[in-house]
Amino acid sequence: MNRRKSREVAMRLLFQTTLNGENLEEALENLKDVRESEDKEKDYESVDLKDVDIDYVKRIIKGIEKNKEEIDGKIKGNLKNWKIERLSKVDLSILRLCTYELKFEEDIPKRVSVNEAIELAKKYSGEKSATFINGVLGKMI
């Protein structure tokens, strides 16, 4: 199983639910259905779902949902001249994912989590966002 791909899927699910208010349980169930079907939905075309650790994705998503206030508080405390409400939904999803890993996933080296977040930002948000996310997360470690 590939942690990088699993993180990417988790970030996409977070983004999806943040953007359209979809229930996380429904999003996870949809992911499971897509993974088991032969035809891939557009949302997941660039990720081979066979390599995704669904249990890890579920743990991350449920952990973020359970600790959302604490995670958002940590993010807010490390934003300089920004409000969390002004962040793009992609950047917020990446920050929530990495903040959760930094705080609750002790088996993952902090630098690995931050580097993965930066790579997600480069892929889904852009170079400026990657620099911004690096700065915010750098204050947390």
Swiss-Prot record:
- Give me the Gene Ontology terms describing cellular component: cytosol
Output the Pfam families linked to this UniProt entry.
NusB
Assigned keywords, A-Z? RNA-binding, Transcription, Transcription antitermination, Transcription regulation
Q: What is the lineage of its organism?
A: Bacteria, Bacillati, Bacillota, Clostridia, Eubacteriales
Q: Which GO terms describe its biological process?
A: DNA-templated transcription termination; transcription antitermination
Functional note: Involved in transcription antitermination. Required for transcription of ribosomal RNA (rRNA) genes. Binds specifically to the boxA antiterminator sequence of the ribosomal RNA (rrn) operons.
Mind telling me which InterPro entries this protein's record contains? NusB-like_sf, NusB_fam, NusB_RsmB_TIM44
NCBIfam families tied to this protein: nusB
What's a single GO MF annotation on this record? RNA binding
Q: Which PANTHER family does the record match to this protein? A: ANTITERMINATION NUSB DOMAIN-CONTAINING PROTEIN, N UTILIZATION SUBSTANCE PROTEIN B-RELATED
Q: What's the name of the protein?
A: Transcription antitermination protein NusB
Family, per entry: Belongs to the NusB family.
Q: Is Transcription regulation given among the entry's keywords?
A: yes
Q: Which organism is it from?
A: Clostridium botulinum (strain Loch Maree / Type A3)
